[in-house]
Amino acid sequence: MLEAGIDIIEISRLERSIKRHPRLLARVFTPAEVAYCLARHRPGASLAARFAAKEAVMKALGIGLGRCSWQDIEITREQGGRPRVILHNRARQLARELGVGEITVSLSHCHAYAAAVALVESSFSEEG
């Protein structure tokens, strides 16, 4: 079974939220995600793309907000630059329970928006 999730976020909205609530960075992103994004030309766009990816993964898994920590879903990069999803703790446990095999994600951003699409392949089937 293949499930999809998609999310889009206004980059400036996330930037304002982080400015008002600096602890948001540590609550939502892993230290590796923060380090990577802050080293980029447009840190806000990179952070927003990862935020959208985390939401898209949650939607594709069907777990919704609150079932796992934001940091339980980590967005890294493979050697060639392709984004990679790493699940930790509760997100990993939920994925196992759902029979999740592979999770792929695609990120994009322009001047104003960041978006992500996640595809989750699982062995679970509603048909039995």
From Swiss-Prot:
Pfam families: ACPS
Compartments, record wording: Cytoplasm
Enzyme type, top EC level: transferase
Alphabetically ordered keywords of this record: Cytoplasm, Fatty acid biosynthesis, Fatty acid metabolism, Lipid biosynthesis, Lipid metabolism, Magnesium, Metal-binding, Transferase
Chief localization: cytoplasm
Cofactors required: Mg(2+)
Keyword Magnesium: yes
GO cellular component, one term: cytoplasm
Binding site for Mg(2+): D7, E55
Enzyme Commission code: 2.7.8.7
Function as written in the Swiss-Prot or TrEMBL entry: Transfers the 4'-phosphopantetheine moiety from coenzyme A to a Ser of acyl-carrier-protein.
Origin species: Moorella thermoacetica (strain ATCC 39073 / JCM 9320)
Biological process according to GO: fatty acid biosynthetic process
GO MF annotation, one: magnesium ion binding
Family classification: Belongs to the P-Pant transferase superfamily. AcpS family.
Protein name in the entry: Holo-[acyl-carrier-protein] synthase
Catalytic activity: apo-[ACP] + CoA = holo-[ACP] + adenosine 3',5'-bisphosphate + H(+)
NCBIfam families tied to this protein: acpS, pantethn_trn, PRK00070.3-2
Domain of life: Bacteria
Xref: InterPro entries: 4-PPantetheinyl_Trfase_dom, 4-PPantetheinyl_Trfase_dom_sf, ACPS, Ppantetheine-prot_Trfase_dom
